[in-house]
């Protein structure tokens, strides 16, 4: 084995006065890495990762930048720019949906995450769509997915109030359904959850019905459910998606709307329908899957000479390991949006625990991830290992401080086992993170469930577990990781990678 890249998802470096689970937890393995290795910090938010200034990073953005070896301009930024320069109004995919609704005398249905979190969506993009529909006298309907994960758990009322003002101003866009993202945006093949949102949107069947969207939220709060967990709710006197309608899904991040879009488009169904899905013109803000034959408003900028491709071209073997919650990140996103593995790229997916929220099992599948990595290193001896530990991020999102501490300590324990095996196999190690999360858990009264804009650690050690004589340069970001890995592999950095090695 030559080199391992270990990504501690959501392990940021922040102040200790915000219930910082990373600093509070006992982390002897990580502390030893910092003591013996060459270490520094990376900026992982805003323009450093291709996002608007001040915007927190996330796992998709982080892994795209890591794999590309360059700052990747994100779909969020591209949509913002299009709205600002007016090209949003002439976008082909958006206009195809609008024109279809006009031609069939149907409606256009907007659906996506109503949030200003900037991770999966931005509420102002929906506002721009409603304004455009109003200008063209198109009957628009909105299906709201509430956040509470990348935003405050009780913040959706303010977003709905603003949305209703936009709807009133432009005379279109009535809200037909409200679903928490736990249901509408599941990504771990919990099809029953996805089906509940689908049934509300298409079949107008749900456990709850209210007169207004705000009532849907307030009644959910009364039941003890925060924004993320609002059960799909129908709003009185509003329509379903029907034959001849158009649908536009406005999330710009793909992984958490794929399942619902698969249902709406009847793509390779892993379920059975009681009735056929309606025949619609379905378009999406970004490309959710390269196998979907759907109009895309902002298709991906193709990434070439990514880390995985360069490793494969050099004739080296690589192993990608994560549990299912982060599997797409160490494969699809790290490969620049490519679904298919490169030559000699082996992938191991470990099923994440079947629990409703990960504070119920903070260790998640970190032990199994480590077991698999150790077995594969000892039996197949890959040249490169890329592994993601999901716990700090996924448990951090629950807002449970005690559980987050347990998650951090679990990862630290597993990291010790993993490092021992890598060093024994002769491997160099880079340990880093893609963004912060567990480094700020808010307060007991007001838990913080979102990512942070804090820097993340970067640590390098040689096979002897030390980094003596090496230093990590200042001013680094995630785009510098791939050049660093290639330097350790003695593989030439391609021109497409504009980052530079972090090791001095």
Curated annotation (Swiss-Prot):
Residues noted as binding Mn(2+) 2 in the record, renumbered to the chain: 9, 59, 434-435
HAMAP family for the chain? GpmI
Q: Name the residues that bind Mn(2+) 1.
A: 393, 397, 451
The family database entries (InterPro entries) matched by this protein are listed as:
Alkaline_phosphatase_core_sf (IPR017850), BPG-indep_PGM_N (IPR011258), Metalloenzyme (IPR006124), PGAM_B_sf (IPR036646), Pgm_bpd_ind (IPR005995)
Q: Which cofactor does it need?
A: Mn(2+)
Gene3D superfamilies, per the entry: Alkaline Phosphatase, subunit A, BPG-independent phosphoglycerate mutase, domain B
Cellular compartments per GO CC: cytoplasm
* Pfam families, per database record: iPGM_N (PF06415), Metalloenzyme (PF01676)
List this protein's GO terms for biological process: glucose catabolic process; glycolytic process
Protein name from the UniProt record: 2,3-bisphosphoglycerate-independent phosphoglycerate mutase
CDD domains named among the record's database cross-references: iPGM
Pathway field = Carbohydrate degradation; glycolysis; pyruvate from D-glyceraldehyde 3-phosphate: step 3/5
Task: Tell me which residues bind substrate.
Answer: 120, 149-150, 181, 187, 253-256, 326
Function (record text): Catalyzes the interconversion of 2-phosphoglycerate and 3-phosphoglycerate.
* UniProt gene name: gpmI
Q: What is annotated as the active site?
A: 59
Q: Which organism is it from?
A: Haloquadratum walsbyi (strain DSM 16790 / HBSQ001)
Record NCBIfam families: pgm_bpd_ind
Q: Which GO terms describe its molecular function?
A: manganese ion binding; phosphoglycerate mutase activity
The UniProt similarity line reads: Belongs to the BPG-independent phosphoglycerate mutase family.
* Catalytic activity annotation: (2R)-2-phosphoglycerate = (2R)-3-phosphoglycerate
Provide the cofactor note recorded for this chain's UniProt entry. Binds 2 manganese ions per subunit.
EC number(s) on file: 5.4.2.12
